[in-house]
Curated annotation (Swiss-Prot):
GO terms for biological process: protein refolding. Transmembrane segments: none annotated. It catalyses: ATP + H2O + a folded polypeptide = ADP + phosphate + an unfolded polypeptide. PROSITE patterns: CHAPERONINS_CPN60. Keywords: ATP-binding, Chaperone, Cytoplasm, Isomerase, Nucleotide-binding. It holds the Pfam family Cpn60_TCP1. It comes from Thermostichus vulcanus (Synechococcus vulcanus). Residues 535-545 have a biased composition (Gly residues). This is Chaperonin GroEL 1. Together with its co-chaperonin GroES, plays an essential role in assisting protein folding. The GroEL-GroES system forms a nano-cage that allows encapsulation of the non-native substrate proteins and provides a physical environment optimized to promote and accelerate protein folding.
Length: 545
């Protein structure tokens, strides 16, 4: 494949063009008056979204170089999403503003390496300042505010997530399900989550989100390594006859047995997923027993005289729903309260009896997993399209809330970044010189971009609003929904400090990379051959082969 090689200014300009396209399509969703974006889907109804990272993932451009620019800025959004679960639009807008400002300086002859050093030092200073200004989240009112803002100013969702956190604790598991009705409701049921994901990505049922969701599955729990597929065949046949999915939780599954499961899954013979058992050694056995109690099944263990090839359906556990990602497995069980309570009592007694603080800690963890249960939010909506949008918003809200509990909250709506700009300016003037100072000033000018965009989406003049906010105290910002200046904490317009910090760090990282780019190598597009006349006669020419 021949390559195109582009140097210097041309390379950076082409990247910038791709970034402009992506940043604009994501920025329209920012703030309470942000608009929606409609995504065309190959199959099914179009999807209406208000979520930065989902939009960013959809954008592919024809020009390979511009597409590289899109991919770079998309990384800022998805890294922020991985770290904090929200703030993707802010990260995109910040990265774009920093790149724009930085390219101007590079074109004027500034040294990109010195600029990058300045950008990194400024970011480090801002991260410390954000931590200083963050307030811890104590009560459920603050949790509700964070969740409501993140779900697109939906107070009902905010209250629901605050309730869920009250019921399952701050470390508890909150899972989302699609409801059969139009209302969104909360339910707390028995369940647990452990830190092991699927053994093979081929088990994923939703390839876009890379997760396996199995409804009403059987659960096979065993402490042995499954090496031969023959051991599994009898139980697989029984499950296939019952017509339900199967989740296997085992110490490990060797290649041959795993390949058989994957092939059956892909051919649609049996909806199956396999997960490695959590923990190690004796602790692993104890956790497998917890899972068996939760799902009303048995651990098929050789030391209990049970063999895998002799297993019967009634030895398997049952769950309402199991969701498996690459790192976690969440089991939602039901109707087995008595056995779970008895098991919890047993663990409590062990905690009282043990002297080792390490064992105590591990037992506490097991108890929390079992006793905490799982809060299930059933997302309801009138149409499929609205349901998907609500589900994405709720997911953002849950992530934002967990981030807020971790690192505290700061004034939202782009306010924190705008108020930190003068502080950064003063610090940089004292501590930095030359081109490093210019690098810090690039960051300082970019800090007002999110607020400016929020104001513009609300139909106001962004530059004027930014200047007015700068004159006010730290906690006071612009409420775009009501078009007034308010104390952001009192008005409940708050962002998790972790989200603001991650957005800033990832934006600065991408900006530094783009500014220090001197050359781009991309594939040369192949010239399209014209079909000779008469080809495909009698066939529709529009088929994809």
């Amino acid at each position: 494949m021949a390559k195109r090689i582009i140097y210097n200014e041309n390379a950076r300009r082409a990247l910038e063009k791709g970034m402009d396209i992506l940043a604009e399509s994501v920025a329209v969703t920012l703030g309470p008056k942000g608009r929606n974006v409609v995504l065309e889907k190959k199959f099914g109804a179009p999807q209406i979204v208000n979520d930065g990272v989902t939009i960013a993932k959809e954008i592919e451009l024809e020009d390979h170089i511009e597409n590289t620019g899109v991919a770079l800025i998309r990384q800022a959004a998805s890294k922020t999403n991985d770290a904090a679960g929200d703030g993707t639009t802010t990260a995109t807008v910040l990265a774009h503003a920093m790149v724009k400002e930085g390219l101007r300086n590079v074109a004027a002859g500034a040294n990109p390496i010195a600029l990058k050093r300045g950008i990194d030092k400024a970011t480090q200073f801002l991260v410390e300042k954000i931590a200083e200004h963050a307030r811890p989240v104590e009560d459920s009112k603050a949790i509700a505010q964070v969740a409501a803002i993140s779900a697109g100013n939906d107070e009902e969702v905010g209250r629901m997530i605050a309730d869920a956190m009250d019921k399952v604790g701050k470390e508890g598991v909150i899972s989302l399900e699609e409801a059969k009705s139009m209302t969104t409701e909360l339910e707390v049921t028995e369940g647990m989550r452990f830190d092991k994901g699927y053994i093979s990505p081929y088990f994923a049922t939703d390839t876009e989100r890379m997760e396996a969701v199995l409804d009403e599955p059987f659960v096979l729990v065993t402490d042995k390594k499954i090496t031969l597929v023959q051991d599994l065949v009898p139980i697989l046949e029984q499950v296939a006859r019952a017509g339900k999915p199967l989740v296997i939780i085992a110490e490990d599954i060797e290649k041959e047995a795993l390949a058989t499961l994957v092939v059956n899954r892909l051919r649609g013979v049996l909806n199956v997923a396999a997960v490695k058992a959590p923990g190690f050694g004796d602790r692993s056995k104890a956790m497998l027993e917890d899972i068996a109690v939760l799902t009303a099944g048995q651990v098929i263990a050789e030391d209990a005289g049970l063999k895998l090839e002799n297993a019967k359906l009634d030895m398997l556990g049952k769950a309402r729903r199991i969701t498996i990602t690459k790192d976690h497995t969440t089991i939602v069980a039901e109707g087995n309260e008595k056995a779970v309570k008895a098991r919890c009592e047993q663990i409590r007694r062990q905690i009282e009896e043990t002297d080792s603080s390490y064992d105590k800690e591990k037992l506490q963890e097991r108890l929390a997993k079992l006793a905490g249960g799982v809060a299930v939010i059933k997302v309801g909506a009138a149409t499929e399209t609205e349901m998907k949008d609500r589900k994405l918003r709720l997911e953002d809200a849950i992530n934002a809330t967990k981030a807020a509990v971790e690192e505290g909250i700061v004034p939202g709506g782009g306010t924190t970044l705008v108020h930190l700009a003068p502080e950064l300016s003063n610090w940089a003037a004292e501590h930095l010189t030359g081109e490093e100072l210019i690098g810090a000033n690039i960051v300082e000018r970019a800090l007002s971009a999110p607020l400016r965009r929020i104001a513009e989406n609300a139909g106001q003049n962004g530059a004027i609003i930014v200047e007015r906010v700068k004159e006010k105290p730290f906690d006071v910002g612009y409420d775009a929904a009501k078009d007034e200046y308010v104390n952001m904490f009192d008005a409940g317009i708050v962002d998790p400090a972790k989200v603001t910090r991650s957005a800033l760090q990832n934006a600065a990282s991408i900006a530094g990379m783009v500014l220090t780019t001197e050359c781009i190598i991309v594939d040369k597009p192949e010239p399209k051959e014209n079909n000779p006349a008469g080809s495909g006669a009698g066939m529709g020419g529009d088929f994809d082969y």
